[in-house]
């Protein structure tokens, strides 16, 4: 005697249920979206480093969430067309996620800085101040970089790095590390403003996959490869 398989019930939302859901979750969703919008709008290294870190965490979580959703779409595809698109999107998301990790690891090997895993950019500016290497992300490799000292406070491209420095501590070269090569910027202009303030302009002078000698005597390491990053 053959058994008849009962088809699983298909649940669909009605318009009233959708409206009820929006009414119940509208306030919470609005707060969450407002929070994310503020973080993405004002999360810059030159404004607030803590807000910028939260922004990077949000961006970093976007890839795994996207992969989870695309896999979910593959498992519960509505039809073969949706299944095909879901498989393609899943493969693309996974490949881009792997490429991101490969590039981040390569940049980490070059700089030794955890900023290498920044999902926003693969450009890390590096400045060696009296043997201490500061590394910060920048959006692009500019033709010039500006380093400013205001009453002992060190700023590079508007990003505060440290305190207790003077113009005489500024190095002759700064670098921008990328995944495949290193950009060297040579100090082209220096101007003193008052007794404890001033600025220097560094101009891009060399690009290539090479090593720049360290300013630390006897360290045997490269300026863009030092491990005492901050």
From Swiss-Prot:
Pfam families: CoV_M. Keywords: Glycoprotein, Host Golgi apparatus, Host membrane, Host-virus interaction, Membrane, Transmembrane, Transmembrane helix, Viral envelope protein, Viral immunoevasion, Viral matrix protein, Virion. It is a multi-pass membrane protein. Residues 1-24, 77-84 are virion surface. PROSITE patterns: COV_M (PS51927). The keyword Nucleus does not apply. The chain crosses the membrane at residues 25-45, 56-76, 85-105. InterPro entries: M_CoV, M_HCoV-like. It is found in: Virion membrane; Host Golgi apparatus membrane. GO terms for cellular component: host cell Golgi membrane; membrane; viral envelope; virion membrane. Its main location: virion. Coiled coil: none annotated. One of its GO terms (molecular function) is structural constituent of virion. Residues 46-55, 106-228 are intravirion. Component of the viral envelope that plays a central role in virus morphogenesis and assembly via its interactions with other viral proteins. Homomultimer. Interacts with envelope E protein in the budding compartment of the host cell, which is located between endoplasmic reticulum and the Golgi complex. Forms a complex with HE and S proteins. Interacts with nucleocapsid N protein. This interaction probably participates in RNA packaging into the virus. HAMAP family: BETA_CORONA_M. Belongs to the betacoronaviruses M protein family. This is Membrane protein. The lineage of its organism: Viruses, Riboviria, Orthornavirae, Pisuviricota, Pisoniviricetes.
């Amino acid at each position: 005697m053959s058994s008849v398989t009962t088809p699983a019930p298909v649940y669909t939302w009605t318009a009233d249920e959708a409206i009820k859901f929006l009414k119940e979750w509208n306030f919470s969703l609005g707060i969450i979206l407002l929070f994310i919008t503020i973080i993405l709008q004002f999360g810059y290294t030159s404004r607030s480093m803590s807000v910028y870190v939260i922004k990077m965490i949000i961006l970093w979580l976007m890839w795994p969430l996207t992969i989870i959703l695309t896999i979910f779409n593959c498992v519960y595809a509505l039809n073969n067309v949706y299944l095909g698109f879901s498989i393609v999107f899943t493969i693309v998301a996974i490949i881009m996620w792997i490429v991101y990790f490969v590039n981040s690891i390569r940049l980490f090997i070059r700089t030794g800085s955890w900023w290498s895993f920044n999902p926003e950019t693969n450009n890390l500016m590096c400045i060696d101040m009296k043997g201490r290497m500061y590394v910060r992300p920048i959006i692009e490799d500019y033709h010039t970089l500006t380093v400013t000292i205001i009453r002992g406070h060190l700023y590079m491209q508007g990003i505060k790095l440290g305190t207790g420095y003077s113009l005489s501590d500024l190095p002759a070269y700064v670098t921008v590390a990328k995944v495949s090569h290193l950009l060297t910027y040579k100090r082209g202009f220096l101007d003193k403003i008052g007794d404890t303030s001033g600025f220097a302009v560094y101009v891009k002078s060399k690009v290539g996959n090479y090593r720049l000698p360290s300013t630390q005597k006897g360290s045997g390491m490269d300026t863009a490869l030092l491990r005492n990053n901050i």
